[in-house]
Swiss-Prot record:
Disulfide bonds: none
Record family assignment: Belongs to the FKBP-type PPIase family. Tig subfamily.
EC number, as in UniProt: 5.2.1.8
UniProt domain PPIase FKBP-type: residue ranges: 158-243
Reaction catalysed by this enzyme: [protein]-peptidylproline (omega=180) = [protein]-peptidylproline (omega=0)
Entry-linked Pfam families: Trigger_C, Trigger_N
Gene: tig
Keywords: Cell cycle, Cell division, Chaperone, Cytoplasm, Isomerase, Rotamase
GO MF annotations in UniProt: peptidyl-prolyl cis-trans isomerase activity; protein folding chaperone; ribosome binding
Compartments in which it is found: Cytoplasm
Name of this protein: Trigger factor
Length: 431
């Protein structure tokens, strides 16, 4: 049967083809002879098992494996011969006539026309980790391990205040009866800023009425956009007790030597990794937005977009489960809400592949190795994690895709109009 290609949509194709029966049988016979040379079956010496027994024992499985291999090989050959560029995996079904006739249905990459990235504008941000950043991180680590003791003076920024509150908004009282118990660290923003400022200087047992105007988008709808009297009573004020940066403290973060210089070196490496990730993410987002704006008119493969939307939904459902919530109430068609974002993801992904192909960009193996080391370094046993990735094709495929995307994004940025911007570490990671 000759290969037949049909267009069944703007981007969907149907390819009808067959696997030659003589080729299938030849490959099956060859594979069965290989098995016969080493097969061990009770009642027969190794290598002396009759061909009929080998056929009965292994024939069905071998034929299925060989057919699958030839099926893929024949399809790939037909796709190459007709210069088709698939935008996802093909679905293969048996044709109505003949056991070795098949129909492959798939979507193709759309025609993007000329891709001119010289019109793009990017901001090349640079930043570096300083000793001040390391000092700040050490202080943050001390704060994470802090304990509390009762303060003998009024509350200050950084103090933990336990309190009871009730609010009066016109004729409405919240709560209707009693009070609400809560706590906040002054300056943390856990409570509304005007309330936290009003608590400064208060001690245990103090009561105060605060005049507060809440913004229109305040999370408590009954208070949003209203001038409210908030009645507060301080139950307790506690001040933080920070651990000393000594050998014990340093070792608790996995620095075996317990030395301050090694601790600072580890922190620097972690901050530099975080900084690099932030700069790359910002550039990826900036370039991605311009790719989307420039090629939003190009139709995307609908099945590929739907698949991406379902993957995004599945990820959200998994996050819901991990948070301890029940996702069973999510409707079956919830993926529709992700279709727009999925379309943009597919667009950027296909453009990245198209740019890489047109400009013969090749995956940099050294960069893949560096990325693997970077990922592994965030774990307690980096060598084991590195080998785990190396030996898992699916994990490696994800890393390789990430690296290839970064290479293409940088290729685009190098050819776009550039503005240089020097940032501090904090500015870089917060943008």
């Amino acid at each position: 049967m000759p290969v037949l290609i049909e267009s069944i949509g703007n981007l969907e194709r149907r390819l009808t083809f067959s696997v030659p029966e003589d080729r299938l049988e030849s490959h099956v016979d060859e594979r069965l002879r290989e098995i016969a040379r080493t097969a061990r079956i009770n009642g027969f010496r190794a290598g002396k098992v009759p061909a009929k027994v080998i056929e009965q024992r292994f024939g069905e499985k071998v034929r299925a494996e060989v057919l699958d291999s030839l099926l893929r090989e024949t399809l790939d050959s037909a796709i190459r011969a007709h210069s088709l560029r698939l935008a996802g995996a093909a679905r293969i079904d048996h044709a109505n006539e003949g056991r070795l006739n098949f129909v492959a249905t798939f979507e193709v990459v759309p025609d993007f026309g000329e891709i001119d990235v010289s019109k793009f504008s990017v901001v090349r941000r640079t930043a570096r980790v300083t000793d001040v950043d390391i000092d700040q991180m050490i202080e943050n680590l001390r704060l994470q391990r802090r304990t509390w003791r009762v303060a003998e003076h009024g509350a200050q920024v950084g103090h933990l205040v336990a309190l009871e509150t009730w609010s009066q908004a016109g004729d409405e009282r919240l709560p209707i009866e009693g009070v609400e118990a809560g706590s906040t660290i002054l300056g943390s923003g856990v409570m509304f800023e005007q309330i936290e400022r009003g608590l400064e200087g208060l001690s245990k047992g103090d009561e105060k009425v605060l005049d507060v105007t809440f913004p229109d988008d305040w999370r408590v709808t009954q208070l949003a956009g209203k001038a409210v009297q908030v009645h507060v009573k301080v139950i307790e004020v506690s001040e933080p007790v920070l651990l000393e940066v000594n050998e014990e403290f340093i070792k608790s973060f996995g620095v075996k030597s317990g030395k301050l210089e090694d601790f600072r070196a580890d922190i620097r490496a972690n901050l530099e990794r975080e900084l690099k990730g932030a700069l790359v993410s910002h550039l990826r987002r900036e370039v991605g937005e311009q790719l989307i704006a420039a090629y939003a008119h190009v139709e995307m493969p609908p099945r590929l977009v739907e698949k991406e939307a379902r993957l995004m939904l599945a990820k959200q459902i998994e996050q819901i489960r991990l948070s301890g919530r029940d996702p069973t109430g999510i409707p079956d068609d919830a993926h529709i809400g992700f279709m727009d974002a999925a379309c943009k993801r597919v667009l950027v992904g296909l453009l990245v592949g198209e740019i890489a192909g047109r400009n013969r960009l090749r995956l940099d193996p050294m960069r893949v190795t560096e990325t693997l080391h970077l990922i592994a370094s965030t774990y307690e046993e980096p060598e084991e994690v590195f080998e785990m990735y190396r030996n898992d094709p699916k994990l490696m495929e994800g890393v390789q895709s990430l690296v290839m995307e970064e290479q293409v994004i940088e290729w685009i940025a190098d050819r776009a109009k550039k503005t240089e911007q020097v940032l501090s570490f904090q500015e870089a990671i917060q943008q």
